[in-house]
Amino acid sequence: ENIMRVKAKKDRYDVTYMAGDDSGFDMMEGALLVLESLDLPINWRRADLGWCMWEKSNKKFGEGDPRCNTVPPETIKAIEETDATIMAAITSKAGVKGFKSAILQMRQLFDLYINLRPAKTLPGIGTPLAKNPDIDIVMFRENTEDLYAAVEFFPLPKEMFDLHKGMDRFREGKGEIAVSWRVFSEEGCMRIIRAAFEYAKATGRKTVHCCNKANVIRQTDGMMKRIFLEIAKEYEQYGIKGIEENADATAMWLIKNPQDYSVIVASNVFGDILSDEASQLTGGLGFA
């Protein structure tokens, strides 16, 4: 995942690189070899984050200390002071008390709302799932909201049962209850959808698909669908067609007819799943 924060043009750029955990060190080593061979005007600055920093901070401050984190203050400072940041891979573990994902923190702290996920066939790379070798899909995944907003409850406060009548059937006989809020905002929908259309306009692409489940999840996905259709009208003058469809149908059609897709915009969770699927059509996540 790349986090680009490019400022005004200058002779040399300061770039923070973060290897993360485990395989991330191998990935970053290879990436730096390639980038340094290009003789780019870059001053490199190393920073750390991920599970390794969680363990290190626990040893330093003690388990349960609020200062324990996957993203240390010096890493945040490095990102703020440099022009761009590249990051490899990190480890996130479930069920660890006090643990906060480094990726989610970075996305929310710096408001990195666009997760741009391309999937394009490359010469010499086999793609057994797709009959048509000419796949060129760019997915705009909203990156800060939805179920990944990290608004969760466990154990569930009793007053939560009174918020919605749909909770009545969970009051008794269900055992423990956990809830994750699916948070959508008008601003969040508007800016990711407009970014997708602006990209299509700038690159000469003629379709933008919005993948949702507004037929079932009527409030959150209903909001995204409504805003998408409103914005789509603005781009008809540029010959760009906005197409909205159910996300589960998209999952099927990506396998059957991937060449029908050019630009896709989706909410955080659907975009996460569909972009991984699309990447496999072109050889795997390593090629996306």
Where are these regions (language model features)?
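Generic N-terminal amphipathic, Lys/Arg-enriched alpha-helix
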Residues: 8-20, 47
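Short coil/turn connectors at secondary-structure junctions
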Residues: 10-14, 40, 81-84, 111-112, ...
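Glycine-rich phosphate/diphosphate-binding loop of Rossmann-like nucleotide-binding domains
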Residues: 16-38, 161-246
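Buried hydrophobic positions in well-ordered alpha/beta secondary-structure cores of metabolic enzymes
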Residues: 21-24, 83, 140, 196, ...
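A short beta-strand-loop structural module common to alpha/beta enzyme folds
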Residues: 41-53
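Short acidic loop-to-helix transition motifs that present clustered carboxylates
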Residues: 50-52, 123-124, 245-252
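N-terminal glycine-rich phosphate/adenylate-binding segment common to multiple enzyme folds
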Residues: 55-168, 179, 269-271
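Glycine-rich phosphate-binding loop
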Residues: 74-94, 239-288
